[in-house]
């Protein structure tokens, strides 16, 4: 197996009790693959019940510098994301960012 130059990190959060994601999965997860050199998000997925949710969020995150997303994510979600899991997306990203920073310290 060749050298891997990315890191995989998952963020977790809760959604509303009546949200379909909560009813189906119990919690909301977002997974990021981040390039070690450029710090760009090269792959993304999340728990979802509607495929368009993951498709939309992929467009938000792919190609962006992972640590810089925190500077604009809340505003972008407020303007462009009308899903009931908006707060969960922000919390899951910040959880993933915290885990990623911990991994980068090693």
What feature does the model see in each segment?
Residues 15, 19-31, 36-106:
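Active-site- and interface-proximal helix/loop "cap" or "latch" segments in soluble metabolic
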């Amino acid at each position: 197996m060749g050298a891997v130059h990315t890191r995989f990190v998952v963020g977790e959060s809760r959604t509303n009790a009546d949200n379909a994601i909560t009813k189906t999965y119990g919690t909301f997860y977002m997974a990021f693959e981040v390039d070690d050199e450029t710090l760009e998000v090269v792959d993304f997925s999340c728990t979802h019940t509607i495929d368009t949710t993951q498709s939309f969020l992929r467009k938000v995150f792919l190609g962006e510098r992972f640590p810089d997303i925190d500077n604009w994510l809340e505003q972008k979600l407020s303007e462009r994301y009308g899903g009931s899991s908006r707060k969960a997306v922000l919390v899951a990203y910040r959880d993933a960012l915290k885990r990623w920073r911990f991994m980068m310290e090693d």
